Regions:
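Extracellular/periplasmic metallocenter environments
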Residues: 29-38, 45, 84-119
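Beta-strand-rich interaction surfaces with strong enrichment in secreted/lumenal proteins
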Residues: 49-51, 79-83
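Bacterial N-terminal signal peptides that target proteins for export
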Residues: 2-15
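Asparagine-centered strand-capping/turn motif at beta-strand->loop junctions
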Residues: 63-65
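Short beta-strand/loop motifs in extracellular/secreted proteins, especially
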Residues: 59, 69-71, 114
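C-terminal segment of classical bacterial N-terminal signal peptides
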Residues: 18-27
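Structural beta-strand segments of beta-rich domains
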Residues: 49, 57-61
Length: 119
């Protein structure tokens, strides 16, 4: 009976490892496929005001706020908003997007506008 228990434990451990690989595999792959785009905010203006990214790939926006005051990255078309405090960086993860133009702005300074062009 001892050997049956050992075989059962070995089989159970193997199944746990295999199931773990299935759970981790897709998320690691999705992170590898993501495209990172960097943008800065200085004097309440996006720099650059127009950014580009590849279509049909997840996008990571790295927003560096160089101002001392907070800003709020917002986009109605992307359905995101993110407050980035002064002198810090924020990250926004976007799903894979279809080709097109996606407007964004600083909700605290609405005159500050930009555009994400996905090609």
């Amino acid at each position: 009976m001892g050997s049956m228990l050992k075989n059962f434990v070995a089989l159970a451990a193997t199944l746990v490892v295999i199931m773990g690989l299935f759970c981790i595999g897709p998320s690691v792959h999705a992170q590898e496929a993501a495209v990172t785009v960097q943008i800065s905010v200085k004097d309440h203006r996006f720099q650059p005001a127009e950014i580009r990214a590849a279509a049909n790939k997840p996008i990571i926006l790295r927003i560096k706020n160089l101002d001392a005051t907070p800003m709020e990255f917002e986009s109605v078309t992307l359905r995101v908003e993110k407050v980035v405090v002064g002198n810090s960086e924020g990250i926004i993860r976007l799903r894979a997007l279809s080709p097109g133009h996606y407007d964004f702005f600083d909700d605290f300074h609405p005159e500050s506008r930009g555009k994400l062009i996905v090609e």
